[in-house]
Amino acid sequence: MSGVLGLPFLFGVGLGALVLAMTSLGQEGKSLWNLAALPINASMLIRAKIIFAVLVSTIGLGFGAVVNVLLVGFSGYSLAAFFLLGITLIIVEASLGVAVGSRFPDFSEGPRPKFVTVTGSIIGSVIGIAVMGAILSPIGVALVLRFLYRITIALSLALSLSVVLGTFLAWASYRLAIRPVQDFLVELPA
């Protein structure tokens, strides 16, 4: 039961990864022209942006794990499930963030740059929350069945379904990001 209390941390870490990845391409600003001169392709740039967002967001996941162990008393299984779900969510949200950020970048520089258009940030936030809900839904269904109806479904099965769904969504988001990044890398003068 204590594992349920870790879900708000997962949502926070997931949204952090989403926002960080969404803004990562727009942060390049005019220095994006430098990328055109480098021997990199779109998939390399996308992977670099995803890896950066994953590494930074993993710090928040570790903090959430420490808080849950100290305050809630996570068991070993709950902690392992928390990390597995957290890493899955971070990778999916970072991939989704780069996909959205590549379609709605804002390269303008000024006193308050946005890095991603308002439309893109709204679309990305709504889709990001929906994706987090979809990934966590097998766990939620298993917990509801267990506590309300006394039907026991192995949480490891629900966790596996969440990870498989997350892996597919991360791959799909990565693939969706490639074409827009290729397009604006080709359009830049070398």
Residue locations for each model-derived region?
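Hydrophobic alpha-helical transmembrane segments of membrane proteins
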Residues: 1-31, 41-190
